[in-house]
């Protein structure tokens, strides 16, 4: 079932992505690079390691201007090779 985010959100709005991926140094840079392409800005992502240290979660908040931007970022963040999940 696909959630109708456009019915739940009023644009522009703050929107936080939580990206979980392998604990590799390039994860944060790759996430920020993708976000910059669709929502240019000055970002300070929060990074938290998993309990065993195999994965990192990267939380990054954008100012979303429309639903297409939100959906495109979900797709492109999920396409990063070392990313395992995007919430």
UniProtKB/Swiss-Prot annotation:
InterPro entries: UPF0250_YbeD-like, YbeD-like_sf. Pfam families: DUF493 (PF04359). NCBIfam families: PRK04998.1 (NF003447). This is UPF0250 protein Spro_1197. GO terms for cellular component: cytosol. It comes from the Bacteria. Belongs to the UPF0250 family. Coiled coil: none annotated.
């Amino acid at each position: 079932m696909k959630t109708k985010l456009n019915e739940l959100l009023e644009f522009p709005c703050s929107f936080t992505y939580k990206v979980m991926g392998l604990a590799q140094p390039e994860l944060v840079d790759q996430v920020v690079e993708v976000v910059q392409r669709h929502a240019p800005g000055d970002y300070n992502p929060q990074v938290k390691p998993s309990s065993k240290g195999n994965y990192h979660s990267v939380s990054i908040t954008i100012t979303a201007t429309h639903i297409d931007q939100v959906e495109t970022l979900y797709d492109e963040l999920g396409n990063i090779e070392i990313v395992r999940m995007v919430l």
